[in-house]
């Protein structure tokens, strides 16, 4: 990592809270949390933006947008973290996530697959997007507000993933996801990075 992160023993109240939330949820402090703890106010603003978009689209669509963006970017951090969150939320099971790592999105609903494609396009060639991209979402009953929030969700993932990559944040061995599944998601991220 190209930065020094706050040590737990000398953490400010805001940083200590970030670390405590990770420990309570996952049993350890993620390296990406430690990196973002350098500026806890910015982290809080990011979390507030996420909380502003999820209500209109729901967790399933949010995770589909997040996973689509993370796969397009090649972010192992976010593929693993949000793969785990997606399994916990019942969006996809382990077999479906393993298939997703192999570019098979069949474990997702038709609407979620459309969101994944939209998020991938936003993350790889946003300058080429047209009304047809939004129309593909509208075909699944998504409203303009939801399309804006899906766009913001994918954009937020680009922001966070690319920031972690630029800061060379190390990838945690996440004990809450099967090692073979984490390895498949890492390999998928590396394919994008080449």
PLM segments and residue spans:
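Hydrophobic alpha-helical segments
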Residues: 1-194
């Amino acid at each position: 990592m190209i930065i020094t992160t706050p040590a737990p023993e000398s953490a400010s109240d805001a940083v200590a809270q970030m670390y405590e939330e990770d420990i309570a949820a996952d049993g350890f402090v993620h390296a990406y949390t430690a990196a973002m703890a350098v500026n806890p106010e910015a982290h809080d603003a990011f979390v507030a933006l996420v909380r502003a978009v999820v209500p209109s689209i729901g967790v399933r669509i949010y995770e589909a947008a997040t996973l689509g963006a993370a796969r397009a970017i090649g972010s192992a951090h976010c593929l693993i973290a949000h793969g785990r969150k997606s399994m916990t939320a019942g969006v996809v099971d382990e077999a479906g996530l393993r298939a997703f790592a192999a570019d098979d999105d069949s474990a997702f609903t038709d609407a979620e697959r459309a969101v994944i494609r939209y998020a991938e396009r936003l993350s790889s060639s946003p300058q080429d997007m047209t009304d047809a991209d939004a129309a593909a979402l509208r075909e699944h009953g998504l409203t303009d507000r939801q399309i804006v929030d899906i766009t913001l969700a994918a954009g937020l993932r680009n922001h966070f993933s690319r920031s972690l990559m630029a800061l060379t944040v190390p990838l945690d061995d996440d004990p809450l996801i099967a090692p073979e599944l984490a390895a498949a998601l890492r390999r998928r991220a590396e394919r994008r990075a080449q």
